[in-house]
A protein has these predicted regions:
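Fe-S-dependent hydro-lyases/dehydratases of central metabolism
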Residues: 2-4, 9-148
């Protein structure tokens, strides 16, 4: 029997059968376009986690996120903007309570501040810190650049 897929994946294959878990087919996350929310939310959270793991989180005085390709072209309509804010705040797409999404986004927008991983607050004004670059990066049509 040959295992195929990411670690923890339930997809297995033998010479005559293929078993696939529903978790191999679908990603759990916010919409309306999970392809434009799940990845960006995970990437934003990983960036913040990396800052903390590197001992840099407390020294950060601001973050900027640049979106490229279709993440930029359809970002607001497909929820990429909200996904980035939630990810930076430490939320995960498969664990966030949907009832907390709107209040969390509203609080960030009204206060002009974002608590990275819920721990360290930095100024965050979307028009200045979440930038929609209407071009693609060379290695992938959907790119993101995080700067602290």
């Amino acid at each position: 029997m040959l295992r195929h897929g990411r670690p923890g994946s339930l997809a297995t294959m033998s010479s005559s059968t293929l078993s696939v878990s529903v978790f191999d087919l679908f990603k759990i996350g916010i919409g309306p376009s999970s392809s434009h929310t799940v990845g960006p939310m995970i990437a934003a959270r990983q960036f913040a986690v990396h800052l903390r793991a590197s001992g840099l989180l407390a020294a950060v005085n601001g973050v900027t996120v640049e979106l490229f390709g279709s993440l930029s072209a359809t970002g607001v309509g497909h929820g990429t903007d909200r996904a980035v804010l939630l990810g930076l705040a430490g939320h995960e797409p498969d664990r966030i309570d949907p009832e907390q999404i709107a209040p969390t986004i509203a609080q960030i927008r009204s206060s002009g501040a974002l608590a990275l991983l819920g721990e360290h607050s930095v100024p965050f004004i979307e028009k200045d810190h979440l930038l929609f670059r209407h071009k693609s990066l060379p290695l992938h049509p959907n790119g993101m650049c995080f700067t602290a």
